[in-house]
Swiss-Prot record:
PROSITE patterns (UniProt xref): INSULIN
Related illness: Silver-Russell syndrome 1: A form of Silver-Russell syndrome, a clinically heterogeneous condition characterized by severe intrauterine growth retardation, poor postnatal growth, craniofacial features such as a triangular shaped face and a broad forehead, body asymmetry, and a variety of minor malformations. The phenotypic expression changes during childhood and adolescence, with the facial features and asymmetry usually becoming more subtle with age. Silver-Russell syndrome 3: A form of Silver-Russell syndrome, a clinically heterogeneous condition characterized by severe intrauterine growth retardation, poor postnatal growth, craniofacial features such as a triangular shaped face and a broad forehead, body asymmetry, and a variety of minor malformations. The phenotypic expression changes during childhood and adolescence, with the facial features and asymmetry usually becoming more subtle with age. SRS3 inheritance is autosomal dominant.
Example GO BP: positive regulation of glycogen biosynthetic process
Keyword Glycoprotein attributed: yes
Signal sequence extent: 1-24
The name this protein goes by in its record: Insulin-like growth factor 2
Post-translational modification (record): O-glycosylated with core 1 or possibly core 8 glycans. Thr-96 is a minor glycosylation site compared to Thr-99. Proteolytically processed by PCSK4, proIGF2 is cleaved at Arg-128 and Arg-92 to generate big-IGF2 and mature IGF2.
InterPro entries, sorted: IGF2, IGF2_C, Insulin-like, Insulin-like_growth_factor, Insulin-like_sf, Insulin_CS, Insulin_family
Superkingdom as given in the UniProt entry: Eukaryota
Record note on what altering R58E does: Does not affect integrin binding. Defective integrin binding and IGF2 signaling
Region of interest called Disordered, as start-end residue ranges on this chain: 161-180
Species this protein is from: Homo sapiens
Annotated keywords: Carbohydrate metabolism, Cleavage on pair of basic residues, Disease variant, Disulfide bond, Dwarfism, Glucose metabolism, Glycoprotein, Growth factor, Hormone, Mitogen, Osteogenesis, Secreted, Signal
Propeptide: 92-180
Length: 180
C-alpha cells in the first residue's frame, strides 16, 4: 500500500514552498549602486559624513571601495557603517581647545571625504533629472547647440512639398529635369 500520487505531490509542493521562504529569509543583503548608495550612506552616517574608500589603516588586505563592495557584492548595515567618517565631537566635550586653522587653509573638502550638505544639492539635481552637461559651466554652449538641434529635428516636415502646384501648369523643377 503506497502513498497516493496526489498526496505525495502536495507534500512535495508544501516542502518546496517552506524551503523557498526560508532561503529568501537568509539570502544575502541587497546591492546598492549610484544614488541609492549615496542616499543610504547619508542616512546611515548622518552628520558624520562618509568615505568612498576606507583609510589604509583600517584594512590589511587589498582595499576595495564601497562601490565595489556594495554594488557588485551584497551590502549590509555593518559594512555601510565601516565607511562612515569619525563622529564629530559632541558639544559637551570641551577637553581639547578648538583648532585654529591658518588663513590660507583650503575651505573645500579634501580627499574622498564628503559631508551631507555637499551631496544634498547633487542628489536633488539627479532626482530632477538634469544631465551632467547642464551642470558643468563649459557645457552650457554645448547644451544650447544640442537643444537647437533637437528643436530643428522636432520641426522637420515629414515630406518635402513641391514649390509649384502641378495641377496649374507646371511640374516641380525636379520632375522636369528627370524627363529630359
Amino acid at each position: 500500500m503506497g502513498i497516493p500520487m496526489g498526496k505525495s505531490m502536495l507534500v512535495l509542493l508544501t516542502f518546496l514552498a517552506f524551503a523557498s521562504c526560508c532561503i529568501a529569509a537568509y539570502r544575502p543583503s541587497e546591492t546598492l549602486c549610484g544614488g541609492e548608495l549615496v542616499d543610504t550612506l547619508q542616512f546611515v552616517c548622518g552628520d558624520r559624513g562618509f568615505y568612498f574608500s576606507r583609510p589604509a589603516s583600517r584594512v590589511s588586505r587589498r582595499s576595495r571601495g564601497i562601490v565595489e563592495e556594495c554594488c557588485f557584492r551584497s551590502c549590509d548595515l555593518a559594512l555601510l557603517e565601516t565607511y562612515c567618517a569619525t563622529p564629530a565631537k559632541s558639544e559637551r566635550d570641551v577637553s581639547t581647545p578648538p583648532t585654529v586653522l591658518p588663513d590660507n587653509f583650503p575651505r573645500y573638502p579634501v580627499g574622498k571625504f564628503f559631508q551631507y550638505d555637499t551631496w544634498k544639492q547633487s542628489t536633488q539635481r539627479l532626482r530632477r533629472g538634469l544631465p551632467a552637461l547642464l551642470r558643468a559651466r563649459r557645457g552650457h554652449v554645448l547644451a544650447k547647440e544640442l537643444e537647437a538641434f533637437r528643436e530643428a529635428k522636432r520641426h522637420r516636415p515629414l515630406i518635402a512639398l513641391p514649390t509649384q502646384d502641378p495641377a496649374h501648369g507646371g511640374a516641380p523643377p525636379e520632375m522636369a529635369s528627370n524627363r529630359k
